[in-house]
Amino acid sequence: MNKPIVGITMGDPAGSGPEITIKALADPEQYSYCRPIVVGDVKVMEQAKKFVGREDIVIHRCEKVSDALFTPGTIDVLHLDLIEDISKFEIAKVSVEGGNAAFQCVKKVIELAMAGEVDATCTNALNKEAMNKALEYYHGEKSDGYTHFDGHTEIYATYTHTKKYTMMLAHHDLRVVHVSTHVSLREACDRVKKDRVLEVIEIANKACKDMGIENPRIAVAGLNPHCGENGMFGTEEIEEIQPAIDIALAEGINIVEKKPTPPDTVFSKALGGWYDIVVVMYHDQGHIPLKVEG
């Protein structure tokens, strides 16, 4: 069977993406797993290989995916002419040009996936400030009228026409999905609503089943210290989270505890194998434990 073709976005050319990509694809072992092709600008990738001291690597310019060689020692780049003058482009600086480049790479790799030209996508880092400056600068002309995205998740949802979605992070058997992500902590608390919590529980259940987990064991983290202590430290668990859990249970979804699990203990249990996935209420509640572990 042919190995899957993986489209890898270059990321913001002022950031770490091009450098990380060169280092990763310089390892021949990657080609035993998949057939990688970078979506980006050849000029940026040529500069990146010099920056990391891998001038032995050949950057192979492709106009279409079928041009790729998929050969160790050669990095295939589906060329998008994104940076006008690479000699004047500043590394580690937020810019409209860099933000637009990063966005166009994501948009293109989604297009390739939707067309079946790549089997999976992998995204390097983009700078949200730079990207949104670019979207606003061009008044949506280079982004189909859109002038703001919070991040990769929202771009993917928009261009795949997906209405119900959330971010998942995974490291081995630790999986996390979020009720909200890139919003202020104050707004994140306001977004803890029954309908959204239920929606994310349902997404988590389906995602685990798609990954081959027959009856996913789900934990739902509370929002407040000790899950609010029966309303003493907040009422979201009583008014929003528990009602969502009750509906999910009635739908046959396996919420192990049948109630919110205290945020300060849910991940010790998850790492101990109690759950297949944890539904968290906001960005850092899920990102911190997963990034510490992974």
Predicted regions and their residues:
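A generic local secondary-structure boundary/capping motif
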Residues: S66, Y156-A157, Y165-L169, K209-D210
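Conserved beta-strand scaffold positions in the cores of enzyme catalytic domains, especially
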Residues: D76-V77, Y165-M167, V176
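Ligand-binding beta-strand-loop-alpha-helix segment within the catalytic cores
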Residues: L169-R191, D195-L198
